[in-house]
Amino acid sequence: MIISAASDYRAAAQRTLPPFLFHYIDGGAYAEYTLRRNVEDLSQVALRQRVLKNMSDLSLETTLFNETLSMPVALAPVGLCGMYARRGEVQAAAAADAKGIPFTLSTVSVCPIEEVAPTIKRPMWFQLYVLRDRGFMRNALERAKAAGCSTLVFTVDMPTPGARYRDAHSGMSGPNAAMRRYWQAVMHPKWAWDVGLNGRPHDLGNISAYLGKPTGLEDYIGWLANNFDPSISWKDLEWIREFWDGPMVIKGILDPEDARDAVRFGADGIVVSNHGGRQLDGVLSSARALPAIADAVKGDIAILADSGIRNGLDVVRMIALGADTVLLGRAYLYALATAGKAGVANLLDLIEKEMKVAMTLTGAKTISEISGDSLVQELGKSLPAALAPMSKGDTA
């Protein structure tokens, strides 16, 4: 199969993975309206083409939290990454490390902190949820610090799990889920051999290390359902600061007032995110939410963004809308499921090339030169007639 874009990796991953795993990462909440709008809204951001600008000295390098990044991209935290490729977190981290960008380990990773951190030279980031079990949170923070993690990504948009209908149909949950997953694995021998048999243990490494016993998929679903904490408030940041003195990024911001609160409570960064459309359907896409948030806090706090980013052009669009750096989630997981470390490395190379093309044709030599001036129009304003939805009676 020819791989020329992230969409090719998605198609390949769908063939490789058992349906319960593919749809778990590919799907969203409820009717998946926000999931679709994340991609569609970003694709409608029109860039301003410029010519004769002497683009011979192009640089994608940027700095974030005193770290130098080869390009303004980091790999987002993704749960169960090790179910998509053999020891998937280790492979993805290696690809990010080789590219010179951060890798973020999820709380609910298959590979524990202590397995991933020693395999890379660059300090990785660690993602944490607010959970009822504060003992686990403290333990995770202490272990992350001991392993040399540089930045904490604190996910706040999940006080309760979203309603994901696809999971019930695919076998991740629902009636006879375990039996359905077993037969799906049998029908996908490549995955069954590489990950199902040789990728063990399949427990949640960070949680198992704390509980002192293996924590498998069924335990994962139950443990998360029982431990998400709806009482989460901004005061939890003060508690976390007692155990974490490094950069802290608040992930899951969609409203300018919440962004201002993040500044007031001393966060170092925010991630403009709707959890990839996996939590509350019907909320704004990240691309639509980003400009107002940037207007409110740009310069006061680092602004990261995720949800809907599929290529280097999307990265440039997000930066033009106000982000300093973006996080990749689904895109890199499709590549990981298809070809492991090599797949993620190739995807990052593709994104780098796509960014260079976009920057060359918009006249931006450096990341700092990508701004609102790079846009023909911002989201939310009237579309040109050629792009506006057809009204009744119009014909294509």
UniProtKB/Swiss-Prot annotation:
Its main location: membrane. It is an enzyme of class 1 (oxidoreductase). GO terms for molecular function: FMN binding; L-lactate dehydrogenase activity. Its cofactor is FMN. One of its GO terms (biological process) is aerobic respiration. Belongs to the FMN-dependent alpha-hydroxy acid dehydrogenase family. This is L-lactate dehydrogenase. It comes from Salmonella enteritidis PT4 (strain P125109). The gene is lldD.
